[in-house]
């Protein structure tokens, strides 16, 4: 079972505080209890329980849904670190089920097939904290406005290609800098342009940061990828297919954890990158059809 007690969850501030506890770490996708144990032993701060990692979803196709509750429970029984699980965008009943299972975080994820193409879940009505993906500042603030306690880049999951995660993180950073240069009288118009709640736009313009932790996800496959995202401003990283689609998952998991911790130390990063077997082959994003892009799901 994960370490966060359900009775400790509830208010938005508490949800954000729980997300803050995961800063500086790695959250790993796992599909069974054996992988969950490998992740925990490697130093992961949390695991994401799912039946198919994103690269398999791409290959196998079909409708990707919430994981089987039995799988989630087996993983909860195996590890002591927090256990997250994904629900489909807009599928609040899947979220209700996951909350009843006492998962530690719910990821309303574009990796799964959206259940609602117009509406995301009202996350404020849940006690369990949510994490959501974004491509830019407007999308981040819309999800936070709905109650997301943690934001991550969408990247392009299941590709082993970090280019989209870099694009999304840079977009967020650039738009925050732009916001900070604005006069207060310009912020309402900017909120309209971003499609974001005005009070959150005001908050970011004043503080220069998102009001919730900002993590990186999507295409991270190597220790260098993890360090790159941390140097760009991510506060933690999610790694999906990059670990268990590699030829040496346990060693690569440890290396990515180390690189996330020592992301500003090139000598250590070189050490973490040595003696690894081949990373996942990966996909050139330019070769994907528009309908195969997961990051475009949601709004």
Swiss-Prot record:
Keyword entries, A-Z: Lyase, Pyridoxal phosphate, Schiff base
EC class: lyase
PROSITE patterns reported in the protein's UniProt record: PDXS_SNZ_1, PDXS_SNZ_2
Catalytic activity: aldehydo-D-ribose 5-phosphate + D-glyceraldehyde 3-phosphate + L-glutamine = pyridoxal 5'-phosphate + L-glutamate + phosphate + 3 H2O + H(+)
Residues that hold D-glyceraldehyde 3-phosphate according to the record: 170
A GO MF term: pyridoxal 5'-phosphate synthase (glutamine hydrolysing) activity
Listed CDD domains: pdxS
Binding-site residues for D-ribose 5-phosphate, renumbered to this chain: 29, 158, 219, 240-241
InterPro entries: Aldolase_TIM, PdxS/SNZ, PdxS/SNZ_N, RibuloseP-bd_barrel
Active site: 86
Keyword Transferase: no
Name listed for the protein in its UniProt record: Pyridoxal 5'-phosphate synthase subunit PdxS
Domain of life: Bacteria
Biological or metabolic pathway of the protein: Cofactor biosynthesis; pyridoxal 5'-phosphate biosynthesis
Pfam families: SOR_SNZ
Subunit structure: In the presence of PdxT, forms a dodecamer of heterodimers.
Species annotation: Protochlamydia amoebophila (strain UWE25)
Family the UniProt entry places it in: Belongs to the PdxS/SNZ family.
EC id: 4.3.3.6
């Amino acid at each position: 079972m994960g370490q966060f007690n359900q009775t400790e969850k509830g208010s938005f501030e508490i949800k954000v505080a729980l997300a803050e506890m995961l800063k500086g770490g790695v959250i790993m996708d796992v599909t069974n209890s054996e992988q969950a144990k490998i992740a925990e032993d490697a130093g992961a701060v949390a695991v994401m329980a799912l039946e198919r990692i994103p690269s398999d979803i791409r290959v196998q196709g079909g409708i990707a849904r919430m994981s089987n509750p039995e799988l989630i429970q087996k993983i909860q029984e195996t590890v002591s670190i927090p256990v997250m699980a994904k629900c489909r965008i807009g599928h609040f009943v899947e979220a209700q089920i996951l909350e009843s299972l006492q998962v530690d975080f719910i990821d309303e994820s574009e990796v799964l097939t959206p259940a609602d193409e117009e509406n995301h879940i009202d996350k404020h009505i849940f006690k369990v904290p949510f994490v959501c993906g974004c491509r830019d500042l407007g999308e981040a603030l819309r999800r936070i406005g709905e109650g997301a306690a943690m934001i991550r880049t969408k990247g392009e999951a299941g590709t082993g290609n970090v280019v989209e995660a870099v694009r999304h993180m840079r977009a967020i950073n650039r738009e925050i800098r732009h916001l900070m240069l604005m006069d207060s009288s310009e912020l309402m118009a900017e909120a309209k342009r971003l499609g974001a709640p005005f009070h959150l736009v005001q908050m970011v313009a004043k503080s220069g940061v998102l009001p919730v932790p900002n993590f990186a996800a999507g295409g991270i496959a190597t220790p260098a990828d993890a360090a790159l995202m941390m140097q760009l401003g991510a506060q933690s990283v999610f790694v999906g297919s990059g670990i268990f689609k590699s030829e040496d998952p346990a060693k690569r998991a440890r290396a990515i954890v180390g690189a996330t911790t020592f992301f500003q130390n090139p000598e250590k990063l070189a050490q973490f990158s040595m003696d690894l077997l081949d990373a996942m082959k990966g996909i050139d994003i330019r070769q994907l059809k528009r309908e195969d892009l997961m990051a475009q799901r949601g709004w």
